[in-house]
């Protein structure tokens, strides 16, 4: 009896295994997904369309990151000129991906535009009165589509002089601002300056001090010609001097400059 029971239990187990084995071949169109993982099969949780961590899942993001790391080239102001006539002139090129037409401003007989172009080679073409044309007087190149375009090469060396002038102007402006903002030298304190009465109402001198040094009043050196006077100061020029009246004669003098020479004229008038 005991052997019969054990054989029956064993037969039931074999029947269950056989049923599971037969259930695996239901049809070619049905596919069972295993929900319980096994350490022996690393692809248990991998669906047919899933990607492994090593696949190119984030390639576009990585490309954008690489592009952002690249240094951007400095834009340089470039003059574009069209001198072949026309009523309306536009320009377009590889610098704006040929997306828009930039108008040129008429200046006398030419059309001019100043564009900020990055360093390197750029192809461009003019749109004159509704037709695409190129300037025959400028360098040309044939594009991949077989069209003839103008070619311009923007180089950093062409703008070194302008960069130096700009840097010098910035340094001079900073220096001038620093000089204007700096305080004058001298001791500083908390006491306010009090004006005295004689300082407040003191009038300026009748004659500036530098005009008191009249060259006609100076003694001439013995070794010099009496007709030659010492070189006057520039503040003495174009002023009228008068000598004190003596023997009923009035004497007037004035000094003028002619290029590198000075001439002093004396006028005598009896009164």
Swiss-Prot record:
Residues 1-47 are annotated as: Disordered. The modification Phosphoserine is found at residues 38, 68, 94, 107, 157, 169, 173, 183. InterPro entries: AMPK1_CBM, ASC_dom, ASC_dom_sf, CRP1_MDG1_kinase, Ig-like_fold, Ig_E-set. The keyword Phosphoprotein applies. One of its GO terms (biological process) is signal transduction. GO terms for molecular function: enzyme binding; protein kinase binding. Phosphorylated when associated with the catalytic subunit (PRKAA1 or PRKAA2). Phosphorylated by ULK1 and ULK2; leading to negatively regulate AMPK activity and suggesting the existence of a regulatory feedback loop between ULK1, ULK2 and AMPK. It comes from the Eukaryota. Keywords: Fatty acid biosynthesis, Fatty acid metabolism, Lipid biosynthesis, Lipid metabolism, Phosphoprotein. Pfam families: AMPK1_CBM, AMPKBI. The modification Phosphothreonine is found at residues 39, 147. Gene3D superfamilies: 6.20.250.60, Immunoglobulins. One of its GO terms (cellular component) is cAMP-dependent protein kinase complex. Belongs to the 5'-AMP-activated protein kinase beta subunit family. AMPK is a heterotrimer of an alpha catalytic subunit (PRKAA1 or PRKAA2), a beta (PRKAB1 or PRKAB2) and a gamma non-catalytic subunits (PRKAG1, PRKAG2 or PRKAG3). PANTHER family: 5'-AMP-ACTIVATED PROTEIN KINASE , BETA SUBUNIT, 5'-AMP-ACTIVATED PROTEIN KINASE SUBUNIT BETA-2. Non-catalytic subunit of AMP-activated protein kinase (AMPK), an energy sensor protein kinase that plays a key role in regulating cellular energy metabolism. In response to reduction of intracellular ATP levels, AMPK activates energy-producing pathways and inhibits energy-consuming processes: inhibits protein, carbohydrate and lipid biosynthesis, as well as cell growth and proliferation. AMPK acts via direct phosphorylation of metabolic enzymes, and by longer-term effects via phosphorylation of transcription regulators. This is 5'-AMP-activated protein kinase subunit beta-2.
